[in-house]
């Protein structure tokens, strides 16, 4: 279980599926941006307005979709200007980034799966949605991404939340925000 919880001074946020420099994501997921430049500026502005230094952002996969070395470098530059400490639970599009030391240094922790704490609550972080997770019967939460806004084929399960950019206003969210949103 993640031991960073004891060192966090601010809030804990979650997000996934930034898909920086994935030109097709705007069209594929009907994102409300004219181009990648507009999307990146929007995400950086919203992120840095909400997340403060001392906060922690747990990114649950797919930070980008690099076509080449320049895209990898651009994603690293963008991540470095985003506020807050960062942890990464890798997604299916993160492999190319993991080869870069300058990318790995941006994160306090990198894992494929994480069972962590958010205050006194336990959270299972995995890029893909899981039907039943560690602590499921004891009140733990599962936070995932990958599906963007396409949840039509997913069974609705209590305490399982999509933290993807596409369904959360393109900004990281807290567990409390997800719980409140689910009650509406």
Model features per residue range: what roles?
Residues 2, 13-15, 20-115:
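Core catalytic region of metal-dependent phosphoesterases/phosphodiesterases
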Residues 5-6, 79, 154:
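Sterically constrained small-residue positions within well-ordered secondary structures
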Residues 102-184:
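Conserved beta-sheet core of the metallophosphoesterase superfamily
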Residues 1-36, 162-163, 167-184:
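Acidic, histidine-bearing metal-coordination/catalytic regions of metal-dependent phosphoesterases
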Residues 9, 53-54, 83-85, 120, ...:
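A general structural motif
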